Amino acid sequence: MTDFEDNPCNAPLHPRAADGLRLFNAGEYFEAHEALEDAWNAEKGIVRDLYRGILQIAVTYLHITRGNYNGAIKVYGRSLKWMKDWADVCRGIDVAGLRRDAETVMREVTRLGIENIREFDLTRLKPVSWDQGFRKQKQIYVCDRCGSEMFEKNCKVTCPNCGNRFDCSDLNIYFD
């Protein structure tokens, strides 16, 4: 058994999650949400909840940029459920830092209240810190059936999410 089978935080980041983090860090919160939602839908393991939590923080920040106090409060409240039980670092993502940053943002949003939300200083929306080289591989194998990332073992691959077996000729291969 590999260490990422024992601990899902040790596995590589889904490629669409990486796209989502890059978009999040560029302040493109709607697009980040879309990419992270793709990763969340493709992922069948427990780490999908981490992607869900991050995408909800992206939506929270989107609401803040649009001056939508109620939307920010509501979506941030939902994100707490998905963000609370993760290791401080998971799949190279500084989860603890993101939680702290989001809590700081929401304290300020709450302080401003619905009447003054448009006064929120957008420079308080910090990027997600993550190790872009974490478990980076030269080739990423993606299951044609469920879209999950797989790992080669002598050109025989089993999808960790749906259990389908493939040989290398059956796979979509993406190069970094």
What does each model-identified segment do?
Residues 21, 59-61:
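Residue-level recognition of tetratricopeptide repeat
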Residues 140, 156, 165:
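Residues immediately within or flanking Cys/His clusters that coordinate Zn2+
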